[in-house]
Amino acid sequence: MTPPAEPPLGGYLVVDLSSGIAGGYCTKLLADGGAEVVKVEPPHGDPLRSWSASGAAIPPDGDGALFSFLACSKQSVLADPDRPGDLDFVRELLDAADAVVWSPGAGLAAHPALAPAEIYRTLPHLTVTSITPFGLEGPWRDRAATEFTLQAWSGGIIGLGRGSPNRPPVFVGGQVGEWVAGAYAAAATMTARFAGLGTGRGELIDLSILEAQILCLTYFPVTFFDTAGRPWRTTRALSVPGVATAKDGLVAVGCGTAQQWSDFCAMTGHPEWVEEASTLSITAQANLVAREIEAWMGSRTVAEIRALATAFRVPNALVGNGANLPFMDHFEARGSFVRNPRDGFTQPGHPYRLRPARLRPFRPAPRLGEHTEKYRALSRPPRPAIERPSTSDRLPFTGLRILDMTAFWAGPSCTHFLSMLGAEVIHLESTSRPDGTRLLAGLPVTEDRWWERSGIFSGLNTNKKSLTLDLRHGRGRELLRALIPTCDVLVENYTPRVLDQIGLDYEGVRTLRPDAIMLRMPGFGLDGPWRENAAFAYVIEDASGLTWLTGHPDRNPLEPYSIGDPNAGVHALNALLLALEHRRRTGEGVLVEAAMVDAALNVAAEQVIEYSAYGALLEAAGNRGPGAAPQNLYPTAGLDEFGRSDCWVAIAVATDEQWAALRGAIGDPEWAASPRLSTAAGRREQQTFIDEHLAAWCEPRTADQVVELLWAAGVPVGKVMQPHRQAELPQLRFRGFFEEVEHPVNGRVRHSTLPIRLSHGPDRFHVSPAPLLGEHNRELLTGLGLSDSQIAALAAEGVIGTAPYSSR
């Protein structure tokens, strides 16, 4: 088939009034999809033009490599906020545009006429996407924050109990919250476009980076707490094996399920390590024999360990970093890395692949103001004025039917976004293999209806329907083939061989519905040497470099144990929205390949870029980071809720002005008055000295006292929250981020929503609880023409059911 003339977003004009990674990545994804992105910059340019995470010198006539990556395929125009004529120019651009992406750090963001609400008030045709730390409204809207302090507030620094109980908690390195917020912003922008088709109406999208972090760095801790009556974990614990030292380097091996732990023990020749009657978690059991596991791993090469683990179906990976990633055999075979079209360094390719729809090939990033005269000379008619439409109950994806053949976190998080905004999502399971998150209830299987009591499953699957079909049974496969033509989209995250073996690859699906969109979410892609490798979040983190930047410098890196899954989900969502737009324009179906590892390589892009461009290998640095000095966690007075002296605050000084504010807030002590501390470079050289004094100042004060003093002065600070306490934050209460959902088994339970608030609603995201297993069998099978007697026969044969096979 001849490729389409243009990518899905061709003709879609986006004005970029943002700065930083989140806005830059949002508009990069839109540009990759074909949008015309015009970046409006002040005379000194976007700060990222002079940024290098390693501190590499950027020549005056050049740009930082990260900027060159994020700005691929964009246009740059200059506008000075102090010149009225330039503001008129920006207004003309906005008049002609379809969307604008805004963040508070941009050069023109402070001008009242260019505030998000004001832009939307005067130009209601526009989709206005605002990206801020806490949201546009609420008690914390103007509070100072950085990626690091937001991770403290989100609970992401604690995560699932990451790290050693004998060390401070440790944040996830690499600015991951900004990258994920950018991906959510791109998806929200395309969602508003989807909703506005035919009406001409715009949308004000209010995105909170804090809320994006909650969804991607923590595992529905509030919902789990409400259903299980306890936190997921009360102490930090190292993943064992996790990232281990082999005879010739680092290797990652993980056990995310009881079966994998059993297989790992068999692989090592120690089946006695499995204690089936034990009440301890897998992590706790593994930690009991950590020294023995360490010795076993250390006596073998990386290749030997990986070959054994793969044979035993135990998840495993090489440990990626900026130096080695482009040369791994799998990524070489798939062409996962390309050359930057302007500066020649190595960068990741697109985070997903579409066929026959296409993404825009990377074009050179613009020089500062390169396209100013072009856009000043253009005469684009402004959009015709529209009446602000009355509020409608119709949600963006009303009328869209999704067959959700995914499990665990990555796939369901993608389809959950759709179900919360109106799509009919049919979650397909079987009684022999229910969704794996149903097993994460934190309860013994002797408990009544244990499979309905998982807060994790509930957190990912509200508003969905449940259908059970045993695909090992011929009748189950027949019914699946009957269901597919009724669905617009099929989403699956099996290893590739599973659907291929039953004739339901994309070509097979097309024979059933020619315009179907098939979204495939394999861990490592549809081809390449690792095609069939088991993929869980932590393995994706290891293989992509996300793990490499997390942990203490004197220890092996620590797996974030979180972001690999939801990051894959939000990138798959972006790809699906592009596919829907392609189908709207052409009538064609689309195969979408959204490999989890490709999404991870993109949010970890800075490592490969820095190494390729500057020869700098970024590494884990504990709780320090390249964007602030000082930046660290400091112990505070008091006991935590578990009776331990384990209370911490996160402090990050990102500017010289914030350093002056910090000095004033702590009484301008003599030690802080040294001229060598007045610059970021000087403070970076003296971080240990500063840390010692800040720790002494924080130690006699409670975390709340430290936060009150420093925030009032404008210093980024955060209390390190236990994740299950997220709902106590005043800002989240103000924004209604958590909603109570009545569940037939679990009762009234708090659920997180989406990290966006939309001017056209909905006022409430959760309209029905997560489905019971097979709850909608009768409804959906009747819709396929089956009679009650036929449905009863299917239940008798075990093709369908409402309880796991092992519980019957």
How does the language model describe each region?
Residues 44, 133-135, 209-214, 248-250, ...:
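Glycine-rich beta-alpha junction loops
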Residues 36-37, 310-325, 425-428, 711-725, ...:
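Short, well-structured beta-strand/strand-turn elements
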Residues 1-13, 245, 321-404, 619, ...:
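Terminal low-complexity tails and localization/encapsulation signals of metabolic enzymes
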Residues 154, 182-203, 219-225, 265-272, ...:
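Oxidoreductase and adenylate-handling cofactor-binding alpha/beta cores
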